UniProtKB/Swiss-Prot annotation:
Biased composition (Low complexity): 532-549
DNA-binding residue intervals: 120-141
Annotated Gene Ontology cellular component terms: nucleus
Compartment(s) where it occurs, according to its Swiss-Prot or TrEMBL record: Nucleus
Compositional bias (Polar residues): 246-266
Residue ranges of the region described as Disordered: 205-227, 246-288, 332-466, 514-549
Record gene name: StuA
Superkingdom of the source species: Eukaryota
UniProt source species: Gibberella moniliformis (strain M3125 / FGSC 7600) (Maize ear and stalk rot fungus)
Occurrences of domain HTH APSES-type (ranges): 86-192
Induction: Expression is regulated by the upstream regulator ada1.
Region called Nuclear localization domain, residue ranges: 516-545
Protein name according to UniProt: Cell pattern formation-associated protein StuA
Keyword DNA-binding among record annotations: yes
Phenotype caused by lack of the gene: Results in near absence of conidia production.
Length: 549
């Protein structure tokens, strides 16, 4: 928020060439004499304190205050002699109001434009009042508005205009705060030299105030209108008479261009029509009937790149290319390969133009010399990268069958019997249900193929999951059988002991004396004391002497 960045031309300058002030202000504050240019010094955030200029004005001749002649202005509408008004304006964005600011004694006192309330805290600070007295006076006010956030000169307790004027008169600071209490304070900003600038500032403040209110009030008459009101034909704003250029070349040509004739020439297309040449050759191959009814994918391994070579059409003249050439060709090649398995009457995708919805194995009826109207702008190049993944599910040039071709060949072998062909040219469905749709070009029997590829026990099966157990089982069968222990024919002691050590000897306690069994073999046997032969004092006396000593 702007905290008061006044322009040099928004208020009057305190410097004049002569100390006499021979002009007076009317009620609206318009001066009668032109003033000099503003001072060239750079301005601060707030204008120079007017108290300094007021002190200089007191020393000027002709100035009389209330102490001299009692001519004290209690209304605040007339300027003191030798003093010129200084006022700045700032938009208070938080409150959505314009604030007029007057500085006295280095303190900025603000007044709102909408309700004319004045910051009482700053006003009493100009009077030099202590904080305790100031807060006590402001708390006793019935109508007050406390502001705790925002710029410093806007914080404080805001009081009505009348109460602020009473406080200023009691503290004798009304003239010091001139022109804070002037009724038409906004007119002081309209200096003859900067009236245009002031009008722009006021209009901008009014416009921002309405924007801050969220459009609750009608916009100001001098506010800028919206872009759509003055520029209805701008490119970013589509109107009723605006037609996008992309429709003129793209979808419009699809609706207005007639279908090409069967054996005639096609008209040249304005935008990328020639890029469909090789793409249409692939489109013709989609609808070309298959003579033998066999899968053309069976011959794919003999090709160099996995695509069968088809002769170009001889009876249809293709339009010339202008721009965008090869984009749809490669995209249509992938589209051709996706549908190519459907030409041999083994369509698992059920997407041939002549196939019946409920019969997925129906033979597709050919549509000779009928073309699909392609896109005019030639965005088919986007199809190639999207359908490269579909090529991975068909055939690769190294001769290995993927899941889709393996299943197609297997079904070709099963359904090649003539007894399974109905007179109408359709393969009969044995269970009466159509096969489910295919996603991403994958065969519906892919999961069954994966289950069929599960390794089974055999001589040539690779090691996958179950063969590890199979080899381990064979190893266990060919290994030397473990010896069978006969616990009945062996002594009990030899089973529980280690074979490297001799069995422990069994001692006969009856044949040996008890002293030799308990004594260590490296030391002689301890003598046996006869307590009956010795007096008891001889045995226990040394211990008593040691215990008491």
């Amino acid at each position: 928020m702007n905290q008061g960045h006044p322009q040099p031309d928004m208020y009057y300058s305190p410097h004049y060439s002569t100390p006499q002030y021979g002009y007076g202000y009317s009620t609206n504050g318009a001066p009668t004499t032109a003033v000099s240019t503003p001072m060239p010094a750079p301005q601060n955030v707030l204008p120079v304190p007017s108290a300094l200029s007021n002190q200089g004005a007191m020393q000027q001749p002709g100035y009389s205050n209330s102490s001299n002649n009692g001519a004290f202005d209690t209304t605040g509408q007339h300027n003191p002699p030798g003093m010129k008004p200084r006022v700045t304006a700032t938009l208070w964005e938080d409150e959505g109001s314009l604030c007029f600011q007057v500085e006295a004694r280095g303190i900025c006192v603000a007044r709102r434009e909408d309700n004319h309330m004045i910051n009482g805290t700053k006003l009493l600070n100009v009077a030099g009042m202590t904080r305790g007295r100031r807060d006590g006076i402001l708390k006793s006010e019935k109508v007050r508005h406390v502001v705790k956030i925002g710029p410093m000169h806007l914080k404080g307790v805001w009081i009505p205009y009348d109460r602020a004027l009473d406080f200023a008169n009691k503290e004798k600071i009304t003239e010091l705060l001139f022109p804070l209490f002037v009724h038409n304070i906004g007119a002081l900003l309209y200096h003859p030299s900067n009236s245009n600038r002031t009008s722009q500032v006021m209009a901008a403040a009014e416009r921002r105030k309405h924007e801050g209110l969220g459009g609750q009030r009608p916009p100001a008459p001098n506010a800028l209108p919206s872009i759509g009101q003055h520029h209805p034909m701008m490119p970013g704003l589509p109107t009723g008479g605006y037609v996008p250029q992309s429709l003129a070349n793209g979808p419009q040509s699809l609706a207005s261009t007639p279908q090409p004739l069967a054996n005639g020439s096609q008209p040249p297309m304005p935008n990328g029509g020639g890029m469909l040449k090789r793409g249409r050759e692939e489109e013709e191959d989609l609808h070309r009937p298959v003579s033998n009814g066999h899968d053309p994918m069976s011959n794919m391994h003999a090709m160099s790149n996995g695509y069968p070579q088809q002769p170009p059409l001889a009876n249809v003249h293709q339009p010339p290319m202008q721009n965008g050439g090869d984009m749809l060709k490669r995209g249509r090649e992938e589209d051709d390969e996706v549908h190519r398995s459907a030409h041999n009457a083994h369509d698992t995708m059920n997407n041939m133009p002549g196939s019946m919805p409920g019969m997925s194995n129906a033979y597709a009826q050919p549509l000779p010399n009928v073309h699909h109207q392609p896109l005019a702008n030639g965005d088919g190049g986007m199809l190639k990268r999207g359908r490269d993944e579909d090529d991975d599910h068909r055939s690769s040039p190294n001769g290995h069958d993927s899941a889709g071709n393996f299943e197609a060949k297997r079904r070709k072998t099963i359904t090649s019997n003539d007894s399974m062909v109905s007179p109408g040219g359709f393969y009969t469905l044995h269970n009466g249900y159509g096969q489910p749709g295919v996603m991403n070009g994958m065969s519906p029997y892919k999961r069954r193929d994966d289950e069929a590829e599960t390794p089974r026990p055999g001589p040539n099966v690779h090691d996958h999951l179950n063969n590890f157990d199979l080899k381990r089982h064979k190893t266990m069968e060919t290994s030397v059988p473990a010896p069978q222990y006969d616990a009945m024919n062996r002594p009990h002691s030899s089973i529980g002991t280690s074979p490297s050590y001799a069995p422990a000897p069994v001692y006969d306690n009856l044949a040996r004396p008890a002293s030799t069994v308990a004594a260590s073999p490296s030391y002689p046997s301890a003598p046996v004391y006869d307590t009956a032969a010795r007096p008891p004092s001889a045995i226990s006396a040394p211990r008593r002497q040691q215990s008491f000593g």
